[in-house]
Amino acid sequence: MYDYIKGTVTTITPEYIVVEAGQIGYQIITGNPFSFQRLEGTEAQVFLYQHVREDNISLFGFQTTEERYLFKKLLSVSGIGPKSALAIIASGDVVPLISAIESEDDVYLTKFPSVGKKTARQIILDLKGKLADVVASEIVYVAPENDMVAGLSPQLEEAVLALEALGYSTRELKKVIPKLSKEEDLTSDAYIKLALQLMTK
């Protein structure tokens, strides 16, 4: 199993890039190969996912570990294959995607190739509440304009603002904040996970 490759980006096509490392050219399928254009001819690090079938071994490439994590989560959904998962990731911004999953916005999800109403509902069913790791690393936190987070620890404040950005209502958050406040010394990521568990019970 490969984790990443470091080498020179030598070729960019509409479907894949080629990275040369150790005098071997690796063909790597990516959601948006042309996003690597600025790296052509230079050394780049590409995070990998190796997909093995009876008749084929493919390498899928990502610019961040968060993209790869989400790709693997999408693969766990019934009806989503590697190419469909990659097409979803290729939108380039994972935050609206995660927000749609958390808010059960199946209309937003059906805009992606090969995702119909049934598949969109399956994505929500399988992944809602399970993407806190990506949320914690991708969301840019904004200073609050209300008193909902007043008096909270910095870690809990970050978690609450992240959940608010994902579309959770003030009412939903106020229900779980007292329970979260009882848990001390948690990271923002841990608070997000706990909050999602409480709200999905």
Curated annotation (Swiss-Prot):
Q: What is its main location?
A: cytoplasm
CDD domains associated with the record: UBA_RuvA_C
Its annotated compartments are: Cytoplasm
GO biological process: any one? Answer: DNA repair
Residue ranges, annotated region (Flexible linker): 143-153
For this record, the Gene Ontology CC terms, alphabetical, are: cytoplasm; Holliday junction helicase complex; Holliday junction resolvase complex
Q: Where is this region: Domain II?
A: 64-142
Q: What does this protein do?
A: The RuvA-RuvB-RuvC complex processes Holliday junction (HJ) DNA during genetic recombination and DNA repair, while the RuvA-RuvB complex plays an important role in the rescue of blocked DNA replication forks via replication fork reversal (RFR). RuvA specifically binds to HJ cruciform DNA, conferring on it an open structure. The RuvB hexamer acts as an ATP-dependent pump, pulling dsDNA into and through the RuvAB complex. HJ branch migration allows RuvC to scan DNA until it finds its consensus sequence, where it cleaves and resolves the cruciform DNA.
Q: Name one GO molecular function term.
A: ATP binding
> What binding partners and quaternary form does the record give?
Homotetramer. Forms an RuvA(8)-RuvB(12)-Holliday junction (HJ) complex. HJ DNA is sandwiched between 2 RuvA tetramers; dsDNA enters through RuvA and exits via RuvB. An RuvB hexamer assembles on each DNA strand where it exits the tetramer. Each RuvB hexamer is contacted by two RuvA subunits (via domain III) on 2 adjacent RuvB subunits; this complex drives branch migration. In the full resolvosome a probable DNA-RuvA(4)-RuvB(12)-RuvC(2) complex forms which resolves the HJ.
**Chain spans, region Domain III:** 153-201
The UniProt similarity line reads: Belongs to the RuvA family.
Does Transcription regulation show up as a keyword for this record? Answer: no
Q: Map out region (Domain I) in residue numbers.
A: 1-63
Q: What is known of its domains?
A: Has three domains with a flexible linker between the domains II and III and assumes an 'L' shape. Domain III is highly mobile and contacts RuvB.
Q: Which residues form a coiled coil?
A: none
Identify the keywords attached in UniProt to this record, alphabetized.
Cytoplasm, DNA damage, DNA recombination, DNA repair, DNA-binding
Lineage: superkingdom: Bacteria
Q: Which SMART domains match?
A: HhH1
Name-wise, this protein is: Holliday junction branch migration complex subunit RuvA
Question: Which Pfam families does UniProt cross-reference here?
Answer: HHH_5, RuvA_C, RuvA_N
